[in-house]
Amino acid sequence: MNGLQDLDWIAVDWGTTNLRVWAMDAASRVLGNGGSAEGMGTLDRAGFEPALMRLIGGWLPAEGRVPVVACGMVGSRQGWVEAPYRPVPCVPLAKGQMARPDTRDTRLAVQVVPGLKQDHPADVMRGEETQIAGLLARQPDFDGVLCLPGTH
């Protein structure tokens, strides 16, 4: 058997210092996960795809394309492909509106989620908003405070 059985898509949280990946099925259940210290800050543009493939290569089928949805510093100016910040408030992106880096491996359909920014008070998020959206999708009645510490 080639690849991870029931793999539907791959979630990626790619920060400055760490890379984390999750294999997901069609119901968004986690099938497997991995991580490395190959954060955006350790790579040049040519290094992103190889770093990702070191973690997910064994999950991919021999043929076909797998959606890979990435958030975090991977979408910064210094990242794999720039996904410019979106001003808030904003509506969710429609399918196909995320940044797409070029890939050599034809099995990868990588999309990078943009960060969010507000002017008053000035602040930005790149990756955290995606994690919050995931929590709210699973717990729509959540009423509390979230603390998502990063490495900088």
Language-model features: locations:
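Conserved phosphate-binding catalytic cores of ATP/NTP-utilizing and phosphoryl-transfer enzymes
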Residues: 2-6, 107-145
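Short glycine-aspartate micro-motif
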Residues: 9-13, 67-69, 144-148
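Short glycine-rich, Thr/Ser-proximal phosphate-binding strand/loop in the N-terminal lobe
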Residues: 9-47
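A short acidic Gly-Thr/Ser loop motif
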Residues: 12-18, 73, 148-152
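Secondary-structure boundary elements
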Residues: 26-29, 61-62, 137-145
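Non-catalytic, solvent-exposed interaction/assembly segments
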Residues: 27, 52-53, 66-69
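Short, well-ordered amphipathic alpha-helical segments that serve as non-catalytic structural scaffolds
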Residues: 46-59
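Short beta-strand-loop/turn "lid" adjacent to the catalytic site in phosphate-handling enzymes
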Residues: 59-125
